[in-house]
Amino acid sequence: MKRVWIVGLLITLLAGAKFGYEYFYFDQNQVGINGYVNPPAKIITLPQIPADGLSSIVVTPEAVQQALNDLGIPAGKVDGKWGQRTRQGFCIWRELTGRKPDRNYPIEFEQREIILLSKTKKSFALNEDFVKGLNVNKACQSVIWVKDGARKDYEISIVSTGASATPTNVGTFKVGWKVNRWYESISIPDGWMYRPMFFNKGQAIHGVESDNYVWWYPASHGCVRLLGAFVDKLWAADFGEGDTVRVYGEYNPVTTDPKI
């Protein structure tokens, strides 16, 4: 009788442990704490040697940063220090490779993949969600400017969208009007906008007095802050009235880095 009781207790404890693991490690959609779906073996398991050149790649923080920049993904200085700009780059890379866009550090396999992509000079295939125009991702604080209907010609840059108290609205909009000079906001005294293009009432894409104000987090009064040189490119390409601005995603300040 005592032996039966002990066996029953062990079964109960094992069942409880399994429930606890599944409840706390995965959410209701079976998405792991690092964003990996249940997590797929191809992401968390290193390849056998050799496997498409992945295993022979020497991984360093500097090499990963350089690879992101070579892929056209802004990732800050190549200094071996993974700061907030590098996190932005990881987020953009995840979006472009069909992963959940977050700013967590990549695991070793992903670092190897980033470097391999840059060495093979492969381009990303944008899916049909991307519109011809500006695609502003609030999760990454980034913009992908798609210049053609085939989604082959595009350029990536960084942005700073509206802070939590004054968020940039999510949706697909059209530029209604633009001003080709410095323009002071009507609602924000001394709020100067460089060559703004208004797409949603008072919300505009525009440059700022210093590119340093294009933070890696949402910090504007509702507009989409852009780098000055990027704004100049938009004007030079005659981007404006009737062109599309798509705003999507949600910024998450929390990062959960894997052990690497």
What is the role of each PLM region?
Residues 42-57, 98-133, 258-259:
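Intrinsically disordered, low-complexity Ser/Thr-rich linker and spacer segments
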Residues 121-214, 259:
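Gly/Pro-biased beta-strand-loop elements
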Residues 1-13:
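N-terminal Sec-pathway targeting helices
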Residues 66-74, 91-99, 148-151, 180, ...:
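Sec-exported extracytoplasmic/periplasmic mature domains
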Residues 49-57, 74-80, 100, 129-132, ...:
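Second-shell loop/turn segments in exported
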Residues 52-61, 69-115:
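Short acidic, glycine/serine/threonine-rich helix-capping segments at coil-helix boundaries
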Residues 13-78, 172:
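Acidic, Ser/Thr/Pro/Gly-enriched interdomain connector segments
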Residues 23-32, 167-170, 182-260:
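Exported/periplasmic cell-wall-interacting domains
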